């Protein structure tokens, strides 16, 4: 099947790209999604308590405010409903194909097109390929000795078993990150015994979450400018946090203030000094993702809950043995161990010029130009590519910035009748050299921890090291001067002989 634009992934990024393409009059596109429905991470993560840690008004498209958010921080089901409504309102759903897992893509240098294969044997040919798979799509499974021998249930939070009956069971949760602080309070309410296995404590702040009054929602619906103002205020409030992550001497005190707030919250929430010591981080705030929760500490102090800080020696058929020799028996093990975020920017094999594979190019860490294009891979765009995620604000803002850039580039490709456009290697290298210098000064590099922001060697491939408005300014237009633009060969008019036969030329 031939198509102008092929988008892989139907989450916030893929759906947003489809909407903007339609608004630009570029209707010849398809969106391939491996799941049975749209939503991306909000379709995958259905565990109890799943919710966003970015305010609702900001975690949405700027062109489609939702006056009916029920809470300041929306839950998974409400976000998924919002995305489904957007797909219908903007007419993108007919462009979507579900259960189409992409297993490979190869660039045809002769034709200037991408050939994309799916798991079910289909092949799509497209002039432009857009990867919108995001960075939270490949669960990270811990390499624990004996895990396969466990006779109870084992599953990852991103692959939640809706049929799992955990009431009155003995359950272990491995991990204490963003998903754990949401699921632990929910599980603690219904299981017989809950063990939370912690390797490194996280910095936890209270979550400023509450129900949004019906009257407030009504005013937002009636006066759209009020909600836009609320969104702007949330944006500014979160953007102010960015300097605290940059860790330059000028801004160090802001980070220390946040640490004091978190420690005060811990002191007030946890009475037991031994437990409090176990929950006190030994690295700078922001080095790992800051956790927001109002009930995580309370859940850890329930009579049926324990925090285990001894390392896991092995998993046995009946439970877990820790390094201190203790044997823990369980009916189920829940893996709240996050995603391979630093390693999944190439979620399927992508082969560019000369057959070079993107994953192989990135074996020492992903790099791109503005997180969106890669030299050697013409007519290829990424949404939420390398170094476009955030430690302080909404990635939807970044996604929309990239979409603006990509749509402008596609218009350039079509308007100038170009065969290919490809970022110059020297431009990409210079951009990443400056980026590495900025990242080296951030708390993510200097804060004394190793996080999912980094590769195994410590290279930070996920986060943008600055203000989001700087990124948006850089993405406001397609900078064609930094690209190699290859036009189609000029077409010679076919010569027609007297007998009406067409001589070999462009038409042959």
Can you annotate each of these PLM segments?
Residues 66-85, 97, 174, 250-257, ...:
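Short beta-strand to alpha-helix junction loop
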Residues 71-136:
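Feature captures the FAD/FMN-dependent oxidoreductase FAD-binding
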Residues 43-54, 144-148, 292-297, 352-379, ...:
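FAD-binding beta-loop-beta segment adjacent to the flavin cofactor pocket
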Residues 141-156, 321-372:
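Central helical "cap/lid" subdomain
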Residues 2, 6-12, 16-17, 21-24, ...:
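Rossmann-like dinucleotide-binding core of oxidoreductases
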Residues 397-400, 404-508:
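C-terminal active-site-capping segments
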Residues 98-113, 306-323:
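A conserved short coil-to-beta-strand element within the FAD-binding core of flavoproteins
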């Amino acid at each position: 099947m031939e198509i102008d634009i092929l988008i892989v992934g139907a989450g916030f990024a893929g759906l947003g790209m489809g909407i903007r393409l339609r608004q630009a009059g570029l209707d010849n596109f398809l969106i391939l999604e491996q799941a049975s429905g749209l939503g991306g991470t909000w379709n995958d993560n259905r565990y109890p308590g799943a919710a966003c840690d970015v305010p609702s008004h900001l975690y949405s498209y700027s062109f489609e405010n939702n006056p009916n958010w029920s809470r300041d921080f929306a839950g998974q089901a409400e976000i998924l409903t919002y995305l489904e409504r957007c797909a219908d309102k903007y007419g993108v759903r007919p462009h979507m194909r579900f259960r189409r897992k992409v297993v490979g893509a190869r660039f045809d240098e002769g034709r200037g097109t991408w050939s994309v294969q799916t798991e079910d044997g289909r092949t799509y040919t497209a002039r432009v390929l857009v990867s919108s798979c995001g960075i939270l799509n490949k669960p990270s499974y811990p390499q624990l000795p004996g895990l396969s021998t466990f006779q109870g249930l084992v599953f990852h939070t991103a692959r939640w078993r809706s049929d799992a009956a955990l009431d009155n069971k003995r359950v272990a949760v491995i991990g204490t990150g963003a998903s754990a602080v949401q699921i632990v309070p929910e599980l603690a309410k219904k299981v017989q015994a809950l063990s939370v296995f912690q390797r490194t404590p996280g910095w936890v702040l209270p979550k400023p979450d509450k129900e949004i009054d019906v009257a407030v929602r009504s005013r937002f619906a009636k006066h759209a400018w009020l909600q836009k103002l609320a969104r702007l205020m949330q944006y500014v409030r979160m953007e102010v946090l960015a300097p605290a992550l940059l860790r330059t001497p000028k801004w160090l005190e802001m980070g220390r203030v946040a640490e004091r707030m978190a420690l005060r919250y811990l002191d007030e929430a946890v009475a037991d000094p031994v437990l409090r010591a176990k929950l006190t981080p030994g690295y700078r705030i922001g080095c790992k993702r800051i956790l927001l929760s109002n009930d995580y500490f309370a859940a850890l102090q329930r009579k049926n809950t324990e925090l285990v800080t001894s390392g896991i020696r092995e998993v046995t058929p009946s439970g877990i043995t820790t390094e201190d020799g203790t044997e823990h028996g369980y009916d189920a093990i829940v893996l709240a161990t996050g995603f391979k975020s630093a390693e999944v920017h190439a979620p399927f094999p992508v082969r560019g010029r000369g057959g070079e594979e993107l994953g192989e190019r990135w074996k020492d860490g992903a790099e791109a130009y503005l997180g969106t294009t890669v030299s050697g891979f013409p007519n290829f765009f990424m949404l939420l590519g390398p170094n476009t995620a955030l430690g302080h604000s909404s990635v939807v803002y970044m996604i929309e910035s990239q979409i603006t850039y990509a749509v402008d580039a596609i218009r350039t490709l079509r308007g100038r009748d170009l065969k290919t456009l490809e970022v110059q290697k020297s431009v990409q290298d210079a951009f990443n050299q400056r980026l590495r210098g900025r990242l080296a000064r951030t708390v993510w590099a200097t804060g004394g921890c190793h996080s999912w922001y980094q590769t195994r060697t410590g290279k930070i491939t996920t986060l943008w090291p600055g203000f989001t408005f700087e990124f948006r300014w850089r993405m406001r237009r397609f900078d064609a001067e930094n690209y190699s633009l290859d036009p189609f060969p000029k077409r010679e008019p076919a010569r027609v002989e007297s007998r009406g036969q067409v001589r070999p030329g462009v038409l042959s």
